[in-house]
């Protein structure tokens, strides 16, 4: 009998079964031949937004991709937990300040706040913002040189100055300009983000004097490194923009140190060198923006009039492309909400269960991004007309402005037909959007 030929167990005598070997009737397979079925992604709705995958995570919270189910616009949501914010110095105050600042800013080079939602039960806040495909720091880290070609750096720097000039015109000092806070859209538009440590000057302030700073150490000017009590806020942003320009054109930093004390000591002295391969006009601009004395430091007007800023630079090197997604290695950065959208529609047609997807209850929808808990009354103008100030238009979905939805008690399911109707409406709305 050939051992290689499988035989029924009953044909082997009891004493010969072990000598034949287990390989006779159990076929070994290689692990590469096993196909693992990935876990099905479960759709989750936060208000009208369908949640996607994680885009990034910082000290304040996570950032995920979302899809607006009404407009089909691709958005990003910053998820903030109140419990986590309490552990960060000035965490809650910084978030509240950022919302108050972003709600009144409208510029193509400043990130736009689209919506704010708050879950009182879970103590979570959702800041919905326009979607940016990549960050400048991520692009720099994707190439060995850690820098951009001069032509590409020039285009980004011009947009940075445009956005910075707008912020200063609104009386806002950013205080933390750096590549990590500069985002990019698919068409290369730069967006200044993260206004958590920014400061809004008083409308009747005589100058731009500031007294506090919480920016990144490597981008701070000498006046802050030396511990001055007061300093010019706008000149702080000019210095940080100069360090950013130095970094994206050389791949280096003008000041470095083994620790923050050594770093501030080097910044406080103000001595730095510029690589010899930098063109003279660029070197002159960098020295003007990184001037030790704030009074002699370039203003935005002087930057705009500089020859390097006004010059059209030829494309001498290949541009740095947007890198593939770090998790999925997707070079096109496709929408991560698609699997959740497919799961939502597919299961909606097959099943009549309420648990098709997760729905966050207790959401406070805010209009014009009113900070949760803030109550504003109508303001009457001099002409007698009332101007409605921002206020929450829906608390737990019970206000008449939106479709009524009373939060039920108990587990959703067949015992709660009202919830089933509400969920079906959401599914039909998303299905209609998909067909369009």
From Swiss-Prot:
The gene is Stk11. The modification N6-acetyllysine is found at residues 44, 48, 96-97, 296, 311, 420, 426, 434. Tumor suppressor serine/threonine-protein kinase that controls the activity of AMP-activated protein kinase (AMPK) family members, thereby playing a role in various processes such as cell metabolism, cell polarity, apoptosis and DNA damage response. Acts by phosphorylating the T-loop of AMPK family proteins, thus promoting their activity: phosphorylates PRKAA1, PRKAA2, BRSK1, BRSK2, MARK1, MARK2, MARK3, MARK4, NUAK1, NUAK2, SIK1, SIK2, SIK3 and SNRK but not MELK. Also phosphorylates non-AMPK family proteins such as STRADA, PTEN and possibly p53/TP53. GO terms for biological process: activation of protein kinase activity; anoikis; autophagy; axonogenesis; cellular response to UV-B; dendrite extension; DNA damage response; epithelial cell proliferation involved in prostate gland development. It comes from Rattus norvegicus. It holds the Pfam family Pkinase. SMART domains: S_TKc. Catalytic component of a trimeric complex composed of STK11/LKB1, STRAD (STRADA or STRADB) and CAB39/MO25 (CAB39/MO25alpha or CAB39L/MO25beta): the complex tethers STK11/LKB1 in the cytoplasm and stimulates its catalytic activity. Found in a ternary complex composed of SMAD4, STK11/LKB1 and STK11IP. Interacts with NR4A1, p53/TP53, SMAD4, STK11IP and WDR6. Interacts with NISCH; this interaction may increase STK11 activity. Interacts with SIRT1; the interaction deacetylates STK11. Interacts with CDKN1A. This is Serine/threonine-protein kinase STK11.
């Amino acid at each position: 009998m050939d051992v290689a030929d499988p035989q029924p167990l009953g044909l082997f005598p009891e004493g010969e079964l072990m000598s034949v070997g287990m390989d006779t009737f159990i076929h070994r397979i290689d692990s590469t031949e096993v196909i693992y079925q990935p876990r099905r992604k479960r759709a989750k709705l936060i208000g009208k937004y369908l949640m996607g995958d994680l885009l990034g995570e910082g000290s304040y919270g996570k950032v995920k991709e979302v899809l607006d189910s009404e407009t089909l616009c691709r958005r990003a949501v910053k998820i903030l937990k109140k419990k986590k914010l309490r552990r960060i110095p000035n965490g809650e105050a910084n978030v509240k300040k950022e919302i108050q600042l972003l709600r009144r800013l409208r510029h193509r080079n400043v990130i736009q706040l689209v919506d704010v939602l708050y879950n009182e039960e879970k103590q979570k806040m959702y800041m919905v913002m326009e979607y940016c495909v990549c960050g400048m720091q991520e692009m720099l880290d994707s190439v060995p040189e850690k820098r951009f070609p001069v032509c590409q750096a020039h285009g980004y720097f011009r947009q940075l100055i445009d956005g910075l000039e707008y912020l200063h015109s609104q009386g806002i000092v950013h205080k933390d300009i750096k590549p990590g806070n500069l985002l990019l859209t698919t068409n290369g538009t730069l967006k200044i983000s993260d206004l958590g440590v920014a400061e809004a000057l008083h409308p009747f302030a005589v100058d731009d004097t500031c007294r506090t700073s919480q920016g990144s150490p490597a981008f701070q000017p000498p006046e802050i490194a030396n511990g001055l009590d007061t300093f010019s806020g706008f000149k702080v942003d000019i210095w940080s923009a100069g360090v950013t320009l130095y970094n994206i054109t050389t791949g280096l930093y003008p000041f470095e140190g083994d620790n923050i004390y050594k770093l501030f000591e080097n910044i406080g002295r103000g001595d730095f060198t510029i690589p010899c391969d930098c063109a003279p006009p660029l070197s002159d601009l960098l020295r003007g923006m990184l001037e030790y004395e704030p009074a002699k430091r370039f203003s935005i007007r002087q930057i705009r009039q500089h020859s390097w800023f006004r010059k059209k630079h030829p494309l001498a090197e290949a541009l740095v492309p947007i890198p593939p997604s770090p998790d999925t290695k997707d070079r096109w950065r496709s929408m991560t909400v698609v699997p959740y959208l497919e799961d939502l529609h597919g299961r909606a047609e097959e099943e009549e269960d309420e648990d098709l997807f997760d729905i966050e209850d207790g959401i406070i929808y805010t209009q014009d991004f009113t900070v949760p808990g803030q109550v504003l009354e109508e303001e009457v103008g001099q002409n007698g007309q009332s101007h409605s100030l921002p206020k929450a238009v829906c608390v737990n979905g019970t206000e008449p402005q939106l479709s009524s939805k009373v939060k039920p008690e108990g587990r959703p399911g067949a015992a709660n037909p009202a919830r089933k109707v509400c969920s079906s409406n959401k599914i039909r709305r998303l299905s209609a959007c998909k067909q369009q």
